[in-house]
Regions:
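Active-site neighborhood of divalent metal-dependent phosphoester bond hydrolases
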Residues: 1-34
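Active-site glycine-rich loop that binds ribose-phosphate moieties when present
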Residues: 24-35, 54-64
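Short acidic loop-to-beta-strand element that houses the catalytic metal-binding Asp/Glu
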Residues: 36-41
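Conserved beta-sheet core of the metallophosphoesterase superfamily
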Residues: 42-137
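Short, solvent-exposed aromatic-acidic interface loops
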Residues: 135-146
Length: 146
């Protein structure tokens, strides 16, 4: 958001109340705006935008597999705008999973009209011990699919 504003609407940046946190009343809603390149934790699940690894996430299978190969922990990202999931168990049977999320934006913007994007979102539930359950949804023709 702020990158677009700096580029296309710089005149607004000098207005004191023109800040994403203030515009959406994040403090009143208990929302923390994460505007830097740092992982966020939802229990034991790491959440990234996905660009933190720069161009080093290759995804010959799907974005979640590429993310899994880099992170080596249970992780979720949204940078690729594609719904995917990848899981593997280690020698001790511990399951590690990665998810990439669809997007809630224009699927064919001018800067990238040909892509593999899809509409989607995720819901994450956590418990007091940090365990988590990810529901990764895809929206097709206005219907939500798990």
């Amino acid at each position: 958001f702020m990158n677009v504003m700096k580029k296309d609407h710089a005149v607004f940046l000098d207005v004191p109340d023109f800040d994403l946190s203030r515009l959406v009343h994040a403090d009143k809603l208990g929302i923390e705006i994460v505007d830097d390149m740092r992982p966020v934790k939802l229990g034991k699940l790491s959440v990234l935008h996905g660009h933190e690894y720069r161009f080093s996430i290759s995804n010959p299978v799907n974005p979640a597999r590429g993310l899994f190969m880099r992170a080596k922990v249970s992780v979720m990202c949204s940078h690729f705008h594609q719904t995917s999931q990848h899981s593997e168990s280690d020698l001790d049977g511990k399951v590690v999973s990665a998810w990439s999320l669809g997007c809630l934006c224009d699927l064919h913007p001018r800067y990238m009209p040909l892509n593999k994007w899809n509409i989607g979102f995720a819901k994450v539930e956590t418990d007091n011990e940090g365990r988590f359950e990810v529901s990764n949804y895809r929206i097709v023709d206005g219907r939500i699919y798990a």
